[in-house]
Amino acid sequence: MDTTTTATQMLHLPSLPVLLSFLLFLLMLIRYWKNSNGQGKQPPGPKPLPILGNLHQLADGQPHHVMTKLCRKYGPVMKLKLGQLDAVIISSPEAAKEVLKTNEIKFAQRPEVYAVEIMSYDHSSIVFAPYGDYWREMRKISVLELLSNKRVQSFRSIREDEVWGLVEFISSNQGRPINLSEKIFTMTNDIIARAAFGRKNSDQHNFTVLLEEIMKIGAGFAIADLYPSLTFLRPLTGVKPALMRIQKKMDKILEDIVAEHKLKRKAAANNNVKLEEEDLVDTLLNYAEATNKNEFHLTIDQVKAVTLDIFSAGSETSATSMEWAMSELLKNPRVMKKAQEEVRQACKGKSKIQEADIQKLDYLKLVIKETFRLHAPGPFTPREAREKCEIRGYTIPAKAKILINLHAIGRDPTVWKDPECFRPERFEGSSTDFKGNHFELIPFGGGRRICPGISFATANIELGLAQLMYHFDWKLANGERLEDLDMSENFGMTARRKENLQVIATTRIPFEK
């Protein structure tokens, strides 16, 4: 090789520092181009760690509490890396409105949750079904048939009967400690069982225990949900075998319920008589047994999925809200006294309250609103971005997991004066409701995926609280002081009390058995 030529070529090559500087500049230019043209303006958030993302920060407490603290620092649209997932936390009414109303089609999808995939018969439930034709049909059936206002009113006698059973139990145990949490959950489960299945079920206790296990696992923060690509981890964490065990037991109970209904329907058809009363399972079986090819048709697995949906969502929402309302009333005796005086004056002379009496109880309704503000039944309303879009000027990538933090919105000091104070009077003269129209108060979500069971849950809560306020005076059991009442939550698909509410009741208004 000609050494002169080689030396001349080397003189024309850039030096190593110059080359590295150029490459670094090019890399920064590419990254800037991606941010400005590809990803757009990203929501702020704490810096994630490799592999973990921001999961280490959630270890400091309940996820919705930690996220509330973080949003006060980073803003109402905050980005978190949860394992492999891109999550955007929404913590203001304005941002929630953009998700649930302005861009509701773009956020009409529910994020995939591993527990739900197994338990809901391949996403056949109303709550978690993918946005599409099946979900639209089921939504229509829910709103017009299963949980319409007319149908909810048809369950009035069931509600009154089961609430009265609770009143009788408390009266027969007055002066003794009562696990009110347990009794409230039993009451709401009995209401749902009779509405959905036609009667209380012998397997109901087992059904409820299995539901509680699902609620703990199905919050979306399991390893399988945070690292969806690492499928080999699922058996190792123990979640998959636990879910399969629960699903097998739950399916057997649901299969028996469906089989019993089929026998009842067949007997009625053979005798050429119409069923006296159709419960919710009967309504679903009408679609499973449809013979017209043009009619919407359900499989038996879909019937079971929707039945499970109704039972779990209905009982948990009503019971959790009643439990928190009673907790706040005990913690705030001024409010309890005012609620008791209202119902005792409005229903004076009556031995029991009828559902028609509820319309007179304006202050009780304010108590329920205030309970929903501080204690939404579920801490988050989850969504998934179906496509790339913008929220409050920030670019949200397709497939991003959206968590609307109801805990943060209910305690936002820019929206609510003294947000930690339980003060129902804040809603006096206000048009704010909880039916998805006012995004500062959305315990049931909003938009087209709003919970269809609002009327059903509200009716249970109103009648239950009215009877408890009317007939009894209350105090905490075991000599516990009001200021020492533990108001901690358990985190799951719902946010129940961490400790059961233990109380002592004294009959104030006598009644006829």
UniProtKB/Swiss-Prot annotation:
Gene3D superfamilies: Cytochrome P450. The keyword Metal-binding applies. The chain crosses the membrane at residues 10-30. GO terms for cellular component: membrane. It catalyses: dihydroniloticin + 2 reduced [NADPH--hemoprotein reductase] + 2 O2 = melianol + 2 oxidized [NADPH--hemoprotein reductase] + 3 H2O + 2 H(+). It is a single-pass membrane protein. Pathway: Secondary metabolite biosynthesis; terpenoid biosynthesis. It is found in: Membrane. Its EC number is 1.14.14.-. The gene is CYP71BQ4. Pfam families: p450. Monooxygenase involved in the biosynthesis of limonoids triterpene natural products such as limonin, a compound with insecticidal activity responsible for the bitter taste in citrus. Catalyzes the conversion of dihydroniloticin to the protolimonoid melianol. Its main location: membrane. Accumulates in mature fruits and in juice vesicles. It is an enzyme of class 1 (oxidoreductase). Keywords: Heme, Iron, Membrane, Metal-binding, Monooxygenase, Oxidoreductase, Transmembrane, Transmembrane helix. GO terms for molecular function: heme binding; iron ion binding; monooxygenase activity; oxidoreductase activity, acting on paired donors, with incorporation or reduction of molecular oxygen. This is Melianol synthase CYP71BQ4. Belongs to the cytochrome P450 family. Its cofactor is heme. Heme binds at C451. The keyword Heme applies. InterPro entries: Cyt_P450, Cyt_P450_CS, Cyt_P450_E_grp-I, Cyt_P450_sf.
